[in-house]
Swiss-Prot record:
This is ATP synthase subunit beta. ATP binds at residues 149-156. It comes from Fusobacterium nucleatum subsp. nucleatum (strain ATCC 25586 / DSM 15643 / BCRC 10681 / CIP 101130 / JCM 8532 / KCTC 2640 / LMG 13131 / VPI 4355). Keywords: ATP synthesis, ATP-binding, Cell inner membrane, Cell membrane, CF(1), Hydrogen ion transport, Ion transport, Membrane, Nucleotide-binding, Translocase, Transport. Pfam families: ATP-synt_ab, ATP-synt_ab_N, ATP-synt_VA_C. It comes from the Bacteria. The gene is atpD.
Length: 462
């Protein structure tokens, strides 16, 4: 058994000297404390037989000279059916007070991405039941989806609604990785999943805001390893939710500074693209099964050009951008219909009718955006009749993009709506064709299908 001694402790970073053989990079080391066993992960070889490690838990109670044992392998976690319905931490230990896991299979969290010839490349649409997403930025089965937004514009609520809509209808396995977010939200999600019965097909892996940077950096890999096992061993189509991928980058930046690396742009770690690539390339579909991932991406100061969101962009198949301007109009989900994109929005994938309606909707909204300056200065009266009609339809389209969510029922008092793609296309096509030009725009706010808008307009007229 390879043993070493602690020589230096700086916050979450611990240096350890080994007399004989040095442990490999990413090996897990263990230190016995009074009430627990602390796990450290090797990050650097410094020379003079010293390795630099990052702690996966608080370093309180550590002292220089303490004995450290090399496990000879990376952090290894339980996977398979045993983890369903349970909450795990970064080390795969249950933290839900429901007894030990009786897992048969264990896997290291550091693994290679699938081989090139194992990948599956067919494109199939994933229906979410959320109008604005299904119409303008449709999600791909086995694809990577990013939800971009600043603080408080609704990323987590949207992720919870997607879990509610997709996980319930999907019937497959879901894995939720809570990376550096609020513990309260994690608790709420667990409660909601337990109530709806989805929990029996879900594994939750949490490394929240209060955890040290090492745990926040690695917890996404723990969740991903659980999802990979369901894909590879059981041939499942797995849903992987990550909230929030920015915190993964943020933790990497903290660890990088503690390890003494020279920072790059905006103070981020120099290996930002490499770290992100190592995670994202493992989230993919193979011949045996698929992983569809939905990742919330916090955008610092609403700046999409910040290196963290910008690096994430390049890995995604669909991006749903949440806008503070739309949220300020009281339209939720606050998805920006002109900024959100999807590789699947092409005639070959979604079909001619869907593609044409989506493009026409974007055209009308873009024209409205151009006219807003004129309206602000000269007022609506100065517009031509054609432009007035465009503005009227654009405002109806904007409001029709709003939708009551099931997960927000307790706050809004409105019953959540799931709208099939066919109904979404039909509704927007009818607005574009002018069939509902006589209906006031308020009738389109927070309804599901177009019939509900018509019914609401009759109620308003009473």
């Amino acid at each position: 058994m390879n043993k070493g001694t602690i020589t230096q402790i700086i916050s979450a970073v611990v240096d350890i000297a080994f007399k004989d053989e040095l442990p490999a990079i990413y090996n897990a080391l263990k230190v016995k404390l009074e009430d627990k066993e602390l796990v450290l992960e090797v990050e650097q070889h410094l020379g003079n037989n010293v390795v630099r490690t990052v702690a996966m838990d608080s370093t309180d109670g550590l002292k220089r000279g303490m004995e450290v044992i090399d496990t000879g392998k990376p952090i290894t976690i339980p996977v398979g059916k045993a983890v369903l319905g349970r909450i795990l931490n970064v080390l795969g230990e249950p933290v839900d007070n429901q007894g030990p896991l009786n897992a048969e299979t264990f896997l290291p969290i550091h693994r290679e991405a699938p081989e090139f010839d194992d990948l599956e490349t067919e494109t199939e649409i994933f229906e979410t039941g959320i109008k604005v997403i299904d119409l303008l930025a449709p999600y791909i089965k086995g694809g990577k989806i990013g939800l971009f937004g600043g603080a408080g514009v609704g990323k987590t609520v949207l992720i919870m609604e997607l879990i509610n809509n997709i996980a319930k209808g999907h019937g497959g396995i879901s894995v939720f990785a809570g990376v550096g977010e609020r513990t309260r939200e994690g608790r709420d999600l667990y409660g909601e999943m337990t109530e709806s019965g989805v929990i029996t097909k879900t594994a939750l892996v949490y490394g929240q805001m209060n955890e040290p940077p090492g745990a926040r950096l690695r917890v996404a890999l723990t969740g991903l390893t659980v999802a990979e096992n369901f894909r590879d061993k059981d041939g499942q189509d797995v849903l992987l939710f990550i909230d929030n991928i920015f915190r993964f980058t943020q933790a990497g930046s903290e660890v990088s500074a503690l390890l003494g690396r020279i920072p790059s742009a905006v103070g981020y770690q120099p290996n930002l693209a490499t770290e992100m690539g190592a995670l994202q390339e493992r989230i993919t579909s193979t011949k045996s099964g698929s992983i569809t991932s939905v990742q919330a991406v916090y955008v610092p100061a609403d700046d999409l050009t910040d290196p963290a969101p910008a690096t994430t962009f390049s890995h995604l198949d669909a991006t749903t951008v949440l806008s503070r301007n739309i949220a300020s109009l009281g339209i939720y989900p606050a998805v920006d219909p002109l900024d959100s994109t999807s590789k699947a929005l092409s005639e070959d994938v979604v079909g001619k009718e869907h593609y044409e309606v989506a493009r026409k909707v974007q055209e009308v909204l873009q024209r409205y955006k151009e006219l807003q300056d004129i309206i602000a200065i000269l007022g609506m009266d100065e517009l031509s009749d054609e432009d007035k009609l465009t503005v009227s339809r654009a405002r109806k389209i904007e409001r029709f993009f709003s939708q009551p969510f099931s997960v927000a029922e307790q706050f809004t008092g409105m019953e959540g709506k799931y709208v099939p793609v066919k109904e979404t296309i039909r509704g927007f096509r009818e607005i574009l064709e002018g069939k509902h030009d006589d209906i006031p725009e308020q009738a389109f706010l927070y309804v599901g299908t177009i019939e509900e808008a018509v019914a609401k307009s009759k109620d308003l007229a009473k």
